[in-house]
């Protein structure tokens, strides 16, 4: 079977093989030959595999979807690859299968003084440097808040560091990231302020104005933005928001909704964490006029 470590060109589904990639972390780049072996071992001609690879302090965390079904023959081959690569964790989700993990060491990430084992393939910021810049901006905007609402909280990128100085309510559409967040909060030392969590689809069930009573709101929606939630925030008495966005177009739409109800942008931070691409991350400080 021929395999490719590849990109797709703009506006195309064509696979273009690559020998190198200047934006990959060195540990991931060094693992490319072994990842190719992984695809050969578990891929099929009829299917498409997706690999999510994260560098952690314990080693690489590799999550695979779309390969062959896990069985007694495949498991030892995958375990041997994880051993050779000294990967922290390898998670395999075949067709119609929940992910099965080979965990050699917990793939721990640091969010402030908390340590979190994220769910396999879960959403994370692209780089530690970008994450640090985003967190610094969010901390600056929310400084002095005694209670913070974190919307689209993921596994705690902002919630856990902010809980060092404030109570936090974290809302996320999936339970697995919140489970990881809660475990990290419980184990943090020194202890954090109180963190509560809520599983809620904010696109379908945005928080209503009478639920938006915290001193500050942090919101980090997906690329599609948070139009439904923005409408509810606009109708609330919310005074301070840190709005994180990876899409200027949807951010402009949502910011207009807020502006029409008396909220305005005080400052905006631009963070170029997607090198050699047109994508940009922004953090806006939004306050009620």
Regions from the language model: what does each represent?
Residues 26-28, 51-55, 149-150, 155:
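Feature of Fe-S/electron-transfer and energy-metabolism proteins
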